[in-house]
UniProtKB/Swiss-Prot annotation:
Transmembrane segments: none annotated. Interacts with CTNNBL1; the interaction is important for the immunoglobulin switch activity of AICDA. Interacts (via its NLS) with KPNA1. Interacts with PKA/PRKACA and PRKAR1A/PKR1. Interacts with SUPT6H, TRIM28 and NCL. Directly interacts with MCM3AP; this interaction may favor AICDA recruitment to immunoglobulin variable region genes, hence promoting somatic hypermutations. It is found in: Nucleus; Cytoplasm. Residues 39-42 are annotated as: Important for interaction with CTNNBL1. A motif (Nuclear export signal) lies at residues 183-198. InterPro entries: APOBEC/CMP_deaminase_Zn-bd, APOBEC_Cyt_Deaminase, CMP_dCMP_dom, Cytidine_deaminase-like. Zn(2+) binds at residues 56, 87, 90. This is Single-stranded DNA cytosine deaminase. Expressed in thymus, lung, spleen, kidney, small intestine, lymph node and tonsil. Its cofactor is Zn(2+).
Amino acid sequence: MDSLLMKQRKFLYHFKNVRWAKGRHETYLCYVVKRRDSATSFSLDFGHLRNKSGCHVELLFLRYISDWDLDPGRCYRVTWFTSWSPCYDCARHVADFLRGYPNLSLRIFAARLYFCEDRKAEPEGLRRLHRAGVQIAIMTFKDYFYCWNTFVENREKTFKAWEGLHENSVRLSRQLRRILLPLYEVDDLRDAFRTLGL
């Protein structure tokens, strides 16, 4: 586990949603864990992690939360803000993990979409997460602002958007929507059949 707050430069470098993210070989994951009790929720923990040699950050988080004694009678919501979306293998592990914890929900807000050489694997991993009930979205100004005020040693400086933040968020959101679109269409079809009583 890293220190509780990130340095400003590290956050801006790793989370910047630039089109070409050369040299950004680490993945950072900021997280919030909440327990939901009826209409209210309680923050249990927050912090950030980064990948370690030989272990992706998503798997580090799964190891971390596996050590908790999660009460099966309570609902938990985990929110991740990641510098890269999960690779296929991590997506598979996360989906499998969530199957064992039906009382835990996960939301992922990614700064950038990760694709390696096999451009079909990572999109399939994102679809697998979506099928497992994970809410996946691209970070917007609001998410960066929240992260800046929650996870960054900001010395009371206000978060300032960089040039292209909004445009890149829109572009990446469209790309993510195209990846998940077949699943949305199936969901829409199911809802239509349900409405018709079929």
